[in-house]
Design a protein with these regions (language model features):
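Non-catalytic cap/lid and distal C-terminal segments of serine-dependent acyl enzymes
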Residues: 1-295
Length: 295
């Protein structure tokens, strides 16, 4: 995957000290930078920075679509566009999308982002380098990641625009309450749980059907190593299992929920985070959170 050649586009490839130490080998992270139209004409100017996270598995090369769109790029180079640096983070991770957060399985992706990658980008491309000038946004997986970054690093970012995020609290993980329900696949009435619905509200697919597909994709014959959605969730939220892989929160074949693993997921449950830390977090988050979700 190559970036479009353009004087306002930069490719960042950084060897992460923290992630490399976790894995015991060289690990690199990537990003694309879209500079503002005035960047060359005002060489002494510093800029605020917007960090964008894509939907599941989205790569940093998505900047190409914007630069190759004449209407967008003509506007971007004009004086009408906001003079802000855009950074497109990369979704690649060891078990699918990295989710840009620290985890027991993928490693310290959150520390890498806030302590290595972002400081490097802001030094290299004249970002203002202050929390007040740093913003984050994304849709779907990116909606979850952007909101999590603002909540878990409240002093580092100054605002989040989160669109249609993944489940942000696990009493409603899709249609499952992982703390109380017994089975991911089957509800209390013995029916298969739907995963998605069509425009008319009718179920299109069950959770079990989707997970059977991920089980086939996984090199361990389970969704844990599929590199798909539930693989990435498991890598992020779960502890490391006895086999060295992320511990599944539910049995890949029967759907039975492991209560101990579900309890470990709590530290990534944003509702729990806010309920337990609201006196401290509330004042820091005032005016910084914007969430947009459809029906």
């Amino acid at each position: 995957r190559e970036l479009v050649e353009n004087r306002l586009v930069r490719e960042v490839e950084l060897t992460s000290k923290s992630i490399s130490a976790f894995w015991g080998k060289e690990m690199k992270v990537k990003a694309a930078v879209l500079l503002p139209g005035s960047w060359y004409e005002q060489p002494g100017r510093e800029y605020p920075v917007r960090y964008n996270i894509a939907g599941y598995g989205g790569r940093y090369t998505r900047v190409n679509r914007l630069v190759n769109d004449p209407a967008f790029f003509d506007w971007w180079r004009s004086g009408d566009a906001p003079q802000i640096i855009n950074v497109f983070l990369d979704g690649e991770g060891p078990f699918g999308d990295s989710y840009q957060m620290d985890s027991d399985n993928s490693g310290p992706y959150g520390a890498n982002l806030t302590e290595e990658l972002i400081p490097y980008i802001e030094r290299e491309y004249r970002g203002l380098g202050t929390p007040a000038s740093r913003f984050v946004d994304g849709c779907s997986t990116g909606g979850w990641v952007s909101l999590a970054l603002q909540l878990y690093y409240p002093d580092f970012f100054n605002g989040v625009w989160s669109y249609s995020p993944d489940a942000i609290e696990f009493e409603n993980y899709q249609l499952v309450n992982i703390y109380e329900d017994d089975n991911e696949y089957i509800n209390e009435w013995g029916n298969l749980r739907p995963l998605a619905r069509d425009l008319y509200g009718d179920p299109m697919m069950t959770v079990k059907d989707f997970l059977q597909f991920e089980n086939v994709l996984g090199w361990s014959n389970t969704y844990v190593t599929s590199g798909s959605q539930f693989s990435a969730h498991t890598a992020l939220y779960s502890p490391k299992g006895a086999d060295g892989l992320p511990a599944p929160m539910f049995d890949p074949h029967t759907g039975e929920i492991d209560r101990a693993v579900a309890e470990h997921w709590k530290k990534y449950d944003m509702k729990v985070l806010l309920q337990e830390n609201w006196p401290e977090l509330g004042p820091k988050l005032q005016g910084k959170i914007y969430i947009w979700m459809g029906d």
